[in-house]
Amino acid sequence: MRGKPKKTSKQPTLSQLAQRAKFAAVMQFLTPANSLLSNTFATPTGAKSRYNLATAYHLQEAVDWDGTEASILYDRALFSKGALLAPQNLAATAVAGNQLQMDWVNNSHGNAQPTDKLTVVVYEPTGRFYEFFMDAATRADATALLVLPPYLTGSQVQVWGFMTDAASPLKSTSQYLGAITVV
């Protein structure tokens, strides 16, 4: 059994400061997406929830420390992790009128079904705002036009997408689609 924590007069080490900053950055990034991650990130094992698994993944793989501050590595960040076949050639493009054009190849084979649903995650880092588009289209549609809120006009957003099986809990691992300026 552990004893009660005690106040210390020792200054934290650089390593401790780095770990605290990384943890804070990951928590600021993931907390608003908690409800999504709790349904889409990997398979819970033992006492670890999906959200805990996502936090552990991001602390190890998707956060950087430059010696003064921690930052999220968006190209390594994940919002889902699973065995479903990912959409092929998934791409996002800004379209005038606060719209986001999503395109992909219908690759319905293996465990991928034409009825699989596309989920899109849009993150605006300056204000730390999220927009989630659940069931945006089916795999067979191969395209979707999403309307973003007006407050994102002119902002650079980070975008991810993944598929969810309509009839089972299977998810594909999310794909980072890049930084896009909303027009």
Where are these regions (language model features)?
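Generic recognition of long tandem-repeat/solenoid scaffolds
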Residues: 1-3, 98-104, 146
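Beta-strand-rich modules
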Residues: 29-40, 146-173
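An aromatic-rich alpha-helical recognition segment common to small helix-rich domains
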Residues: 30, 102-104, 120, 161
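Long, polar/Ser/Thr-enriched low-complexity segments
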Residues: 1-88
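Solvent-exposed loop/turn segments flanking beta-strands in beta-repeat/beta-sandwich domains
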Residues: 108-127, 154-157
